[in-house]
């Protein structure tokens, strides 16, 4: 095969690679319906970044859309007063867990539990749902960390063991 033939083969290969790479479009992160909802929530956060409810709704929308990295960014870029809210820390812990950072998620969930402890008057600043959810997730995260699992998604069988260990019931037989 002559030099011209080899040049033709190489040029044809390069052209086919170029055509194949140029025809695929990037997939959107959010669906059309989710993007409309998220756009409205992003506008609310941009207008009032110190509103914990707006930050919570936006971070939750990102978690629902399975983009925990964006949820982390929303929480980490929020003012410190917002980040200290227990519900925001609870969402932050979930985003950290979804990102494969179990140790950091456990620390965030422990901050939620510390913030939800009853004060001297016996009242808590957290509702019962948040307290129950944070307690359950902290138990599961503690088991994950004890088993040495940093990324629960990468080790589903160990995650199942941790979940089972954290949620099993203890029965007491009284005779």
Language-model-derived ranges and their functions:
Residues 1-40, 174:
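Long, contiguous interaction/recruitment modules in multidomain scaffold/adaptor proteins
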Residues 121-175:
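Terminal, low-structured helical/coil segments at or just beyond the last alpha-helical repeat
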Residues 31-34, 68, 102:
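TPR-repeat structural position
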């Amino acid at each position: 095969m002559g030099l011209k033939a080899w040049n033709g083969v190489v040029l044809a290969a390069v052209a086919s690679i170029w055509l194949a790479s140029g025809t695929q479009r990037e997939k959107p992160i959010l669906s059309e319906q989710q993007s409309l909802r998220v756009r409205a929530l992003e506008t609310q956060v941009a207008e009032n970044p110190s509103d914990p409810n707006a930050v919570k709704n936006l971070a939750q929308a990102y978690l629902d859309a399975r983009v925990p990295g964006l949820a982390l960014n929303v929480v980490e870029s929020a003012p410190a007063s917002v980040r200290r809210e227990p519900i925001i820390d609870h969402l932050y812990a979930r985003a950290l867990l979804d990102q494969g950072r179990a140790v950091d998620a456990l620390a965030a969930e422990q901050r939620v539990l510390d913030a939800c402890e009853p004060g001297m008057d016996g009242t808590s600043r957290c509702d019962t749902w948040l307290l129950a959810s944070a307690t359950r997730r902290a138990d599961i995260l503690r088991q994950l960390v004890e088993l040495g699992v940093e990324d629960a998604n990468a080790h589903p069988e160990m995650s199942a063991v941790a979940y089972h260990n954290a949620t099993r019931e203890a029965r007491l037989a009284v005779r």
